[in-house]
């Protein structure tokens, strides 16, 4: 797992924060300077936090536990959903339903309903319903798939969540905190880094910044999964 270089972080615009008037003073330790009214993030601190977060995520993945990816802002959705799929981890990129984790039993019931509808449509077991009812079912399944598709295979609460933009995803942050689930997050200059366990100071609005940080998180998870698989094979022999 190779950490991005200073120049790579710079090229990805990771250092660009928000206007000074929007800053959160608790981000002071991660800010390098102010330039033309905009706070610039200290990329050396970003690199330190990245490495710390990566090592922790690697160990979680190595232990066989699930890590949920959360990013519902438009510029992050595709990046994060593809990243999560690449390591077979759950994700939420459309809308965070209240109680996604704190009311997990209800969410599982909704997922079960979605899967039942999908099975029924796939099997063609729809002879007893009208075309209008069939259309309604199809639309309901599509709507549920958009919101719940990323957690369809999540049978227990995740052990950690990786979040892009903790202001936007404050519900996810709050639920994770209430349940004692470890939080890893990209934290911009307008946010409170103390709200998460592993803050990564970074521009959470730029797609390039989101991609480079998310990619490193995925590489850490992949490394953990590979080490886990190697240990399982060794034990089997």
What are these regions (language model features)?
Residues 87, 92-194:
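Long, charge-patterned amphipathic alpha-helical coiled-coil/hairpin "stalk" segments used as oligomerization
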Residues 171-226:
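Short glycine/threonine-rich loop/turn motifs
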Residues 48, 135, 208-212:
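A generic "alpha-helical surface" signal
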Residues 1-66, 72-73, 77-120, 131-134, ...:
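N-terminal cationic and glycine-rich segments that engage phosphates or anionic surfaces
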Residues 75-76, 168, 205:
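Glycine-/small-residue-rich active-site loops that bind phosphorylated ligands and cofactors
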Residues 13, 69, 161, 213:
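Residue-level signature of catalytic and energy-coupling elements of molecular machines
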Residues 70-73, 163-165:
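Short His-Asn-centered micro-motif
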